[in-house]
């Protein structure tokens, strides 16, 4: 490829400098004025999309807070590609996993079948942003032909590391379609999934968005928004220096209360929120609800160049439709006011369709070391891809928009 690379393993992201990592993770200029609230003439949508989750700050916060560590079953094992001068040309955020929790691409059935057949499914390699079902680059390199050659080298390096560690597999999840195609050419099995995203059709106000819906859906959303704020509930958008420790204390209480009730054990530690608030607060929007002078619920969002990413939600009081208001309607309103092109509200949830979030295909790629297991999974994925494509078309008919 013309460039001699040395590939090595880093057991912490801090073995790579923040500036060098970020130059590969987000090589475009990034639109850091997304938080300014200044009026725009068009949507924010760039070829070099800034993705907050692959930034050094976000991944470092996961490690520094011990949300990600060997004890949690997420042992950092990042792949670094350097030249003869030590300059960084490629990185892969990679982890050795001893379980399949916190991934949002489900392979529990594969693990169970392999274990029953006498194999060891764990350890496995996971290339992703832990606990974050949001699409973003995974083979981090500069754009263009030279970067493509580096990505090819990284794809092969992951297989080499898998073999050296005697791991069962490599799983690259929530990657962009072009990386999915590249990994397919390197022998990875290709998998598709479905999420629900909202797209901004150049709406000027939330009412403009409502006007695009059928009359019935429009009335339902208006009623839900009114009911959500019944009893004097107010909503507040907090960002930057407004993300004080007392605010994070309140949100963490929501996160733990809801997470413990729904999932058993939330993944993130309290320290994580302070760290991201300090290092990337200008990329965070915390949508909080207050009643009788106290915080009662909140939704944590991260802002890319053109996308608002909804991540975590929690509440200590139950109010009808408050979850929809904070996670879906307020997110749409924020995106409209900031001229963002999309809202990604996390994994799963067909109930989002009625609120304007439409089915969208997401991607993962999987290298399976055992030939027999690889053949079985390949057959399964062939059927699953057909099902996902058919489901996307079927669910699109349930969209709430007016039919001309």
Please state what every model-predicted region is.
Residues 1-404:
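N-acyltransferase acceptor-side catalytic subdomain
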């Amino acid at each position: 490829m013309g460039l001699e690379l040395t590939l090595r393993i880093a057991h912490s992201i801090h073995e790579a400098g923040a500036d060098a990592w970020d130059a590969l993770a987000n090589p475009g200029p990034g639109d850091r004025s997304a938080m300014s609230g200044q009026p725009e003439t068009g949507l924010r949508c760039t070829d070099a999309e800034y993705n907050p989750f692959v930034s050094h700050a976000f991944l470092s916060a996961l490690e520094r807070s011990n949300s990600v560590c060997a004890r949690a079953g997420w042992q950092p094992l990042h792949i670094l590609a350097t030249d003869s001068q030590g300059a960084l040309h490629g990185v892969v955020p990679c982890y050795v996993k001893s379980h399949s929790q916190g991934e949002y691409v489900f392979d529990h059935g594969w693990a169970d079948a392999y274990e029953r057949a006498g194999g060891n499914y764990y350890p496995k390699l996971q290339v992703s942003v832990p606990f974050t079902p949001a699409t973003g680059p995974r083979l981090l390199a500069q754009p263009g032909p030279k970067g493509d050659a580096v990505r090819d080298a990284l794809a092969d390096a992951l297989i080499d590391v898998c073999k050296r560690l005697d791991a069962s597999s490599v799983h690259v999840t929530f990657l962009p379609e072009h990386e999915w195609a590249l990994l397919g050419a390197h022998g990875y099995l290709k998998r598709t999934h479905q999420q629900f995203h909202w797209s901004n059709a150049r709406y000027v106000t939330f009412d403009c968005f409502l006007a695009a819906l059928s009359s019935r859906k429009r009335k339902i959303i208006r009623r839900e928004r009114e009911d959500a704020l019944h009893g004097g509930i107010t909503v507040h958008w907090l960002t930057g220096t407004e993300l004080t420790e007392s605010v994070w204390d309140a949100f963490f209480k929501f996160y733990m209360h809801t997470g413990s009730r729904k999932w058993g054990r939330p993944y993130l530690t309290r320290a994580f929120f302070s760290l991201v608030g300090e290092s990337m607060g200008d990329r965070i929007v915390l949508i909080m609800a207050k009643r009788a002078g106290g915080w009662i619920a909140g939704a944590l969002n991260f802002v890319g160049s053109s996308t608002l990413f909804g991540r975590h939600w929690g509440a200590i009081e139950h109010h009808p439709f408050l979850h929809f208001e904070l996670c879906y309607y307020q997110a749409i309103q924020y995106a409209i006011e900031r001229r963002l092109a999309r809202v990604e509200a996390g994994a799963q949830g067909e109930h989002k369709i009625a609120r304007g979030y439409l089915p969208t295909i997401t991607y993962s790629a999987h290298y399976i070391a055992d030939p027999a297991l690889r053949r079985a999974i390949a057959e399964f994925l062939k059927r699953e891809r057909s099902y996902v494509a058919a489901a996307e078309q079927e669910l699109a008919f349930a969209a709430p928009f007016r039919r001309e």
